[in-house]
Amino acid sequence: MEFNKAQNIIGLRVLNDNVIWLWVKDKSVVVIDPSVHEPVIRYIDENNLHLKAILQTHHHSDHIGGTKPLIERWQNVKVIASSKEKKRIPFQNVSVEDGETLNILGEEVKIIEVLGHTSSHIAFFLNGENPVLFIGDTLFSGGCGRIFEGTYQQMYSSLERIKSLPKDTLIYCAHEYTKSNILWALNLKPKDQDLKNKLSEVEKKLSLNKLTIPFLLDEEMKINLFLRAKNLEEFTFLRANKDLWV
């Protein structure tokens, strides 16, 4: 478990590399992409919190696996997901569209459609004094999501949307993939000093059993080859190359 004091966001490590984010305000909590339920219930009970909502970025089982047990345990919980996911996230009770704005825990949260990994992936953007983006599997530190249902064009466009956000946006992705991503990037750009520095930083955090996420958009744009891609052709080459990386 890791706690971001400035944002009141807690990360629970689960499965092999998933991270479930819990956004806490006063005694209320919002859970983002609960892949499992047991550690979430434990944390909520131990801290006497009230589950208010679950945010679902997409339908993959390692993001929704814990949702049903959570809404069976607590009543009147909002399950917020894309309106395009009604069949694949059938327990959603708040269906949202791209560009829609919600009030969650007293904060304005904007829905941003980020297609590519799936055909209906969304992100949740808190545009406050300390901007936050819950991005699911669209962007990782040093990488981006595999393209399962969408197209290269959709993923490239999604990353361009992310790049247009405030540069001090703190990005919360759903997997701890950073070291592998940086090693891949260094294989392509072995002399890149920003990547070398990032690898040292990542290895230090991991040696202390700390997460390497979340990450700042401004810093990520310097080291993420997908965000640095100048056009669709370059992005397509990088994504195809990364798919072959072992």
Curated annotation (Swiss-Prot):
<dbReference type="GO" id="GO:0046872">
    <property type="term" value="F:metal ion binding"/>
</dbReference>
<dbReference type="GO" id="GO:0019243">
    <property type="term" value="P:methylglyoxal catabolic process to D-lactate via S-lactoyl-glutathione"/>
</dbReference>
<feature type="binding site">
    <location>
        <position position="175"/>
    </location>
    <ligand>
        <name>Zn(2+) 2</name>
    </ligand>
</feature>
<feature type="binding site">
    <location>
        <position position="62"/>
    </location>
    <ligand>
        <name>Zn(2+) 2</name>
    </ligand>
</feature>
<dbReference type="InterPro" id="IPR036866">
    <property type="entry name" value="RibonucZ/Hydroxyglut_hydro"/>
</dbReference>
<comment type="pathway">
    <text>Secondary metabolite metabolism; methylglyoxal degradation; (R)-lactate from methylglyoxal: step 2/2.</text>
</comment>
<comment type="subunit">
    <text>Monomer.</text>
</comment>
<comment type="function">
    <text>Thiolesterase that catalyzes the hydrolysis of S-D-lactoyl-glutathione to form glutathione and D-lactic acid.</text>
</comment>
<dbReference type="InterPro" id="IPR017782">
    <property type="entry name" value="Hydroxyacylglutathione_Hdrlase"/>
</dbReference>
<keyword id="KW-0479">Metal-binding</keyword>
<feature type="binding site">
    <location>
        <position position="137"/>
    </location>
    <ligand>
        <name>Zn(2+) 1</name>
    </ligand>
</feature>
<dbReference type="InterPro" id="IPR050110">
    <property type="entry name" value="Glyoxalase_II_hydrolase"/>
</dbReference>
<dbReference type="InterPro" id="IPR032282">
    <property type="entry name" value="HAGH_C"/>
</dbReference>
<feature type="binding site">
    <location>
        <position position="63"/>
    </location>
    <ligand>
        <name>Zn(2+) 2</name>
    </ligand>
</feature>
<dbReference type="Pfam" id="PF16123">
    <property type="entry name" value="HAGH_C"/>
</dbReference>
<dbReference type="Pfam" id="PF00753">
    <property type="entry name" value="Lactamase_B"/>
</dbReference>
<keyword id="KW-0378">Hydrolase</keyword>
<protein>
    <recommendedName>
        <fullName>Hydroxyacylglutathione hydrolase</fullName>
        <ecNumber>3.1.2.6</ecNumber>
    </recommendedName>
</protein>
<feature type="binding site">
    <location>
        <position position="58"/>
    </location>
    <ligand>
        <name>Zn(2+) 1</name>
    </ligand>
</feature>
<feature type="binding site">
    <location>
        <position position="60"/>
    </location>
    <ligand>
        <name>Zn(2+) 1</name>
    </ligand>
</feature>
<comment type="similarity">
    <text>Belongs to the metallo-beta-lactamase superfamily. Glyoxalase II family.</text>
</comment>
<dbReference type="GO" id="GO:0004416">
    <property type="term" value="F:hydroxyacylglutathione hydrolase activity"/>
</dbReference>
<keyword id="KW-0862">Zinc</keyword>
<dbReference type="InterPro" id="IPR001279">
    <property type="entry name" value="Metallo-B-lactamas"/>
</dbReference>
<feature type="binding site">
    <location>
        <position position="137"/>
    </location>
    <ligand>
        <name>Zn(2+) 2</name>
    </ligand>
</feature>
<dbReference type="InterPro" id="IPR035680">
    <property type="entry name" value="Clx_II_MBL"/>
</dbReference>
<feature type="binding site">
    <location>
        <position position="117"/>
    </location>
    <ligand>
        <name>Zn(2+) 1</name>
    </ligand>
</feature>
